[in-house]
Amino acid sequence: MPVLHNRISNDALKAKMLAESEPRTTISFYKYFHIADPKATRDALYQLFTALNVFGRVYLAHEGINAQISVPASNVKTFRAQLYAFDSALDGLRLNIALDDDGKSFWVLRMKVRDRIVADGIDDPHFDASNVGEYLQAAEVNAMLDDPDALFIDMRNHYEYEVGHFENALEIPADTFREQLPKAVEMMQAHKDKKIVMYCTGGIRCEKASAWMKHNGFNKVWHIEGGIIEYARKAREQGLPVRFIGKNFVFDERMGERISDEIIAHCHQCGAPCDSHTNCKNDGCHLLFIQCPVCAEKYKGCCSEICCEESALPPEEQRRRRAGRENGNKIFNKSRGRLNTTLGIPDPTE
């Protein structure tokens, strides 16, 4: 029976990937469609992807598939053909090709079955996720940006919006997509007469969000086809002005794709212009935050002096200190400081 999960250490896999000479292509895609048996589908796709040396992160659920992957350049054509042939619902599926890609985005294949491909918190049995808003292409996006009756809503997390967004786009102040959905409805109640344009990284969140807005009585709803990634690609190909400012945060080793030259964020430690996210090098922290090169050297890649000191301790002492700590999702929020703080480690700005 084939092995349907990875058995090699992360360090060994990363070293193997970095030693590869063949270029890789980072691809993301999603599809909302009914999967009767997600577990069987997962196992079949795992074998297909493994045979083509595909790395990345793939989620499957009864509602569909969501994938961010890295494919050897020589296998991209074969991968596309086999994916399209795997299920009729996937035939002709749009694949978002990364914009700013060094091919080192992933080094292991992780494929999981979940309740939803995007955690939305929706439990309304009458919600129809297929009743989505209209798609917008690149030229239409630019026209909407100039329309005084249009409102752009960013359906990404605060740390994504912080480093890049469309001109005058509205940020929904939340830390997760499930928190954003009810807030978006609440914030837009006074603007039901407006044209609402929703966007996200690759389209998966704004597509569902557009359906949620329509479910809640909003009739003028659009969303950007393929999200920021596809918009920027098509705008460049068509010689259109790219109206997205800054960097597009991505959920892989790169942590961002450069869309425009503007740097609109700041180092969370010293305030210098910077839009480079990193995770605190202290294994007892791993806070996601923005750090400039000067502070990276000063704090040795850590978010605070305490983390810097702790990361320099012998490994056994570090493990002893980590024992019993809360291991939550730690993200620095510029307005509220640290979220789900690791016990005993202060906010880096204090």
From Swiss-Prot:
Mention one GO molecular function. oxidoreductase activity, acting on paired donors, with incorporation or reduction of molecular oxygen
What enzyme category does the UniProt record give? Answer: oxidoreductase
- Give the record's keywords alphabetically: Oxidoreductase, tRNA processing
InterPro entries reported in the protein's UniProt record:
Rhodanese-like_dom (IPR001763), Rhodanese-like_dom_sf (IPR036873), Rhodanese_C (IPR022111), TrhO (IPR020936), TRHO_N (IPR040503)
Q: Where is the Rhodanese domain?
A: 146-240
Question: What positions does UniProt annotate as the active site of this protein?
Answer: 200 (cysteine persulfide intermediate)
Short name of any one Pfam family annotated for the protein: UPF0176_N
SMART domains reported for this sequence? RHOD (SM00450)
Known EC number: 1.14.-.-
Q: Which domain of life is it from?
A: Bacteria
Keyword tRNA processing attached:
yes
Task: Name the PROSITE patterns for this protein.
Answer: RHODANESE_3
CDD domains named in the record: RHOD_YceA (cd01518)
Q: Tell me, in a sentence or two, what this protein's role is.
A: Catalyzes oxygen-dependent 5-hydroxyuridine (ho5U) modification at position 34 in tRNAs, the first step in 5-carboxymethoxyuridine (cmo5U) biosynthesis. May be part of an alternate pathway, which is able to bypass cmo5U biogenesis in a subset of tRNAs under aerobic conditions.
Q: What family is this protein classified in?
A: Belongs to the TrhO family.
**Name the UniProt record assigns to this protein:** tRNA uridine(34) hydroxylase
- Gene name, Swiss-Prot/TrEMBL: trhO
